[in-house]
UniProtKB/Swiss-Prot annotation:
It catalyses: Eliminative cleavage of (1->4)-alpha-D-galacturonan to give oligosaccharides with 4-deoxy-alpha-D-galact-4-enuronosyl groups at their non-reducing ends. Ca(2+) binds at D214, D238, D242. GO terms for biological process: pectin catabolic process. This is Probable pectate lyase 8. InterPro entries: AmbAllergen, Pec_lyase, Pectin_lyas_fold, Pectin_lyase_fold/virulence, PEL. Residues 1-24 form the signal peptide. The keyword tRNA-binding does not apply. Pfam families: Pectate_lyase_4. It comes from the Eukaryota. Pathway: Glycan metabolism; pectin degradation; 2-dehydro-3-deoxy-D-gluconate from pectin: step 2/5.
Length: 416
């Protein structure tokens, strides 16, 4: 009877959340079509998923659960390889609606080559990502893919590296430009180089000249509904994850970042005010060894930094300019030994008379080895509504929730 009541109660909460989402009125008619109008709805639904996973754990269904709602949604399934597309229902935060190639067929990459970026060979990753149809892209075997030019992705694609060891390395890397519904999961991306001044195909019917690319691991440009999850990213020429030019509805989760200078840029420039539509969730990531700054570095928009583990930085962890709203909740910050680098935050190119009005708050964060967060602006929760995307858990649980960050060593027939 108690279990029945719990299920009925959870169902009622879900119906209520959906009713709120359907009937929420648009508060700003000029607001970007992909931005979240009711972040409280997002937080309520994610909070429900956390409670549900906890209840299942209590009932014995998920003895391997960690409290990380993304992982608890799929990782305990021994038959995950037979239900790969279930992953698309597990996203949270602002990028929660990214379905990738869920509604399409599977495409198996069999060839690691990239001989011709204009006429890619069937079976290559480039041939897969440029197709117009939705595709869930998987890999036949372990492989290292060295791209000659940017891998320009078409909409409704999932790159799923689970079950094999896939590296995109030592060449060009991923470009997500003017597209929607992309999932990148379970791959290693490292040692990316600047490339360009070349012709590159972006769809079956189009190719064109590309100027020089910066050498980002993952570049998100003018795109929406993007989910970057469980990847290992390091040592690229520019950024590891950069999102610019009105990109929004993005979740960056469960990634392992190492050995890099400028880790994550969110916002094109101080003068590009169209990035005010940007909403990004940064959750359950491990910012690890050899990192220097920009975890992330934000401009203009709304950024929810929640339940991440910051174990290394040399300059600062979270920075920004041009008045972004930053909502830091339940993170663990371990400051470096350097006594002049203990501060988590950095305001770029702006005096205190201006940045004191920016809404930057720290709530429930854990500060170790002298780390500290300089708050500014309003403290009230209402001012952070557009920078709220999920319910933070206690910072004491961060170590457990991020312990499997990065590309996972998944094997068929075993819990991932």
């Amino acid at each position: 009877m108690a279990v029945t009541k719990l299920i009925l109660f959870a169902s009622a909460l879900l119906l209520t959340a959906l009713f709120i989402g359907v009937n929420a009125s648009r508060s700003n008619e000029t607001w970007h079509e992909h931005a979240v109008e009711n972040p409280d709805e997002v937080a309520a639904m994610v909070d429900m998923s956390i409670r549900n996973s906890t209840e299942r754990r209590r009932l014995g269904y998920f003895s391997c659960a960690t409290g990380n709602p993304i992982d608890d949604c799929w990782r305990c399934d021994r038959k995950w390889q037979l239900r790969r597309k279930r992953l698309a229902d597990c996203s949270i935060g602002f990028g929660r609606n990214a379905i990738g190639g869920r509604d399409g067929r599977f495409y198996v990459v069999t060839d690691p080559g990239d001989d011709d970026p204009v006429n890619p060979i069937p079976g290559t990753l480039r041939h897969a990502v440029i197709q117009d149809e939705p595709l869930w892209i998987i890999f036949k075997r372990d492989m290292v893919i060295t791209l000659k030019q940017e891998l320009i992705m078409n909409s409704f694609k999932t790159i799923d590296g689970r079950g094999v060891n896939v590296h995109i390395a030592n060449g060009a890397c991923l470009t997500i430009q003017y597209v929607t519904n992309i999932i990148v999961h379970g791959i290693h991306v490292h040692d990316c180089k600047p490339t360009g001044n070349a012709m590159v195909r972006s769809s079956p019917s189009h190719y064109g000249f590309r100027s020089m690319a910066d050498g980002d691991a993952i570049s998100i440009f003018g795109s929406s509904h993007i989910w970057i999850d469980h990847n290992s990213l390091s040592n690229c020429a520019d950024g590891l994850v950069d999102a610019v030019m009105s990109s929004t509805a993005i979740t960056v989760s469960n990634n392992f970042f190492t050995h890099h200078n400028e880790v994550m840029l969110l916002g094109h420039s101080d003068s590009y005010t169209r990035d005010k539509v940007m909403q990004v969730t940064i959750a359950y990531n491990h910012f690890g060894e050899g990192l220097i700054q920009r975890m992330p570095r934000c401009r203009h928009g709304y950024f929810h930094v929640v339940n991440n583990d910051y174990t290394h930085w040399e300059m600062y962890a979270i920075g920004g300019s041009a008045g972004p709203t930053i909502n830091s909740q339940g993170n663990r910050f371990l400051a470096p030994v350097n006594p002049f680098a203990k501060e988590v935050t950095k305001r770029e190119y702006t005096g205190e008379s201006k940045w004191k009005h920016w809404n930057w708050r720290s709530e429930g964060d854990l500060f170790l080895n002298g780390a500290f967060f300089t708050r500014s602006g309003a403290g009230a929760g209402a001012n952070y509504a557009r920078a709220s995307s999920l319910s933070a858990k206690s910072s004491s649980l961060v170590g457990t929730m991020t312990s499997y960050s990065g590309a996972l060593n998944c094997r068929a027939g075993r819990r991932c």
